[in-house]
């Protein structure tokens, strides 16, 4: 094993990278509340893992979506556990994100020179809320259907561009298969990709600028 490690070490300088990661200075005022962002990241990773597992059984059609969710909960091996963990970690992610925002605001972590870190955090907050809206519709039960109908109908109040926005969100003039397909695509591909990109930006900025000092 040592020869294999030495081969990689010679080419990638793994030890130098590890030393750089583990030797970052942590200010003495940092406490448990500074871990809220990391907990949010952990919840996101749990979401990715459990969501990926459910894609093996979920069918994004208006005729089969609800039945496929029932199959996951009642027949698929550990399906009930995977979906339950997915739901619990989703709620935990939202809660931890809200607490993280309050902590950053109350400790002044949004001030110069960390404005861009704050902006990426706000974008991540919007993406997290979007996860909730799109994921809520996927079982395609009564609650999910009417939630989608109400949410996608909100832009209709905007003058001129309201109706085109509604049709863009729904994929047609009314809520149906096109809507479910779009929400499934957003929930399983677009939003996770954007979240991963903005999380990477967020953490790189924190890594570069360090943790903000005490008030």
From Swiss-Prot:
Please name the taxonomic classification of the source: Eukaryota, Viridiplantae, Streptophyta, Embryophyta, Tracheophyta
Chain positions recorded as heme b 2 binding sites:
86, 187
**GO MF annotations, alphabetized:** electron transporter, transferring electrons within cytochrome b6/f complex of photosystem II activity; metal ion binding; mRNA binding; oxidoreductase activity
Q: Which cofactor does it need?
A: heme b; heme c
Topology relative to the lipid bilayer, per the entry, is:
Multi-pass membrane protein
Question: Which positions, given as ranges, span the membrane?
Answer: 32-52, 90-110, 116-136, 186-206
Top-level taxon of the source organism? Eukaryota
Gene responsible for this protein = petB
Q: What is this protein called?
A: Cytochrome b6
């Amino acid at each position: 094993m040592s020869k294999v490690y030495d081969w990689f070490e010679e080419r990638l300088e793994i030890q130098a990278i590890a030393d750089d990661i583990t030797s970052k200075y942590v200010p003495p005022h940092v406490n448990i509340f500074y871990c809220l962002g990391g907990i949010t990241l952990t919840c996101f990773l749990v979401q990715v893992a459990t969501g990926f597992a459910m894609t093996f059984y979920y069918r994004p059609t208006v005729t089969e979506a609800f039945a496929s969710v029932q199959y996951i909960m009642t027949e698929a091996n550990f399906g009930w556990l995977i979906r339950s963990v997915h739901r619990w970690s989703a709620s935990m992610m939202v809660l931890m994100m809200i607490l993280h925002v309050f902590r950053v605001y109350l400790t002044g972590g949004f001030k110069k020179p960390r404005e861009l870190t704050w902006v990426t955090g706000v974008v991540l907050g919007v993406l997290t809320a979007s996860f909730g809206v799109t994921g809520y519709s996927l079982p395609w039960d009564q609650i999910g259907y009417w939630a989608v109908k109400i949410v996608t109908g909100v832009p209709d109040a905007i003058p001129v561009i309201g109706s085109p926005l509604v049709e863009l969100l729904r994929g047609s003039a009314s809520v149906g298969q096109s809507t479910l397909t779009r929400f499934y695509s957003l929930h399983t591909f677009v939003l996770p990709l954007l979240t991963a990109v903005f999380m990477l930006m967020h953490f790189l900025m924190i890594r570069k600028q360090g943790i903000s000092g005490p008030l």
